[in-house]
Amino acid sequence: MAAGPIIAGPIIAGRAGRLKIAVLISGGGSNLQSLIDHFGPGVAASPIEIVLVLSNRADAYGLQRATAAGLPVKVIEHRGFPDRAAFDAALDGALRAAGAELVVLAGFMRLLTPGFIEAWHDRLVNIHPALLPSFRGLDTHRRALKRGVKVHGCTVHFVRAEMDTGPIIAQAVVPVEAEDTPESLGVRVLAAEHKLYPAALRLIADGCVTVEQDRAVVRSAPANAVPLFSPPLKAD
């Protein structure tokens, strides 16, 4: 697979018009729906255009969400390929044919090959249901509760070959409640994801994100942010 250009400085430096994104899904597509609500057809002054919704599963409900919104959809079943590299080559071809500038993973349940990730270096983002670098991988809510952390949350990051290790773009913090179960905590984290992902993509589209020494820097971050305490501190 031929590698695309390695982007230096702002992720969208020199780009004219709206940022063209492709969204990759495998299931229900609730994060996709949030992106549709923020950037879909008919959204006034959107800095982002969704040029393709692609799934590796024909039965993914997210495809229905995309079709209802009038978005282009495509299915590439991974089971029809002899290996991961062949599947990723087909994926790469579809993304480039659609004119995608940024690839957005939204519940895409396939590990991508290092060659694909390098081809889309700093043009491939994911959202993870934990505050990275803590709780990489699966089953994050149960593991967070088992460790007794007082805050949990979600992270938007650029993708690297090692899972859940890429430069962190944005995070949302969700306080953990004493009676939380993995399910109840997961509901609140997912609600935070639906707000965080569109906000992070807008930062990229607006040219606010750079990658410097494999660290994502966001120039629009407010100064003197107020710390969050969990449990909340009692008033003096």
Put a short name on every predicted segment.
Residues 69-70, 120:
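Short, structured coil segments at secondary-structure junctions
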Residues 2-61, 65:
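N-terminal Rossmann-like dinucleotide-binding module
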Residues 38, 106-219:
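Donor/substrate-binding cores of folate-linked one-carbon enzymes
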Residues 74-79, 127:
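Short beta->alpha connector loops at strand-helix junctions that form conserved
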Residues 72, 101, 150:
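Residue-level detector of anion-binding/catalytic polar loops
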Residues 2-20, 43-47, 75, 195-236:
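An anion-binding loop in the catalytic cleft
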Residues 55-57, 79-80, 84-85, 98-114:
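N-terminal glycine-rich "phosphate-gripper" loop used for MgATP/nucleotide binding
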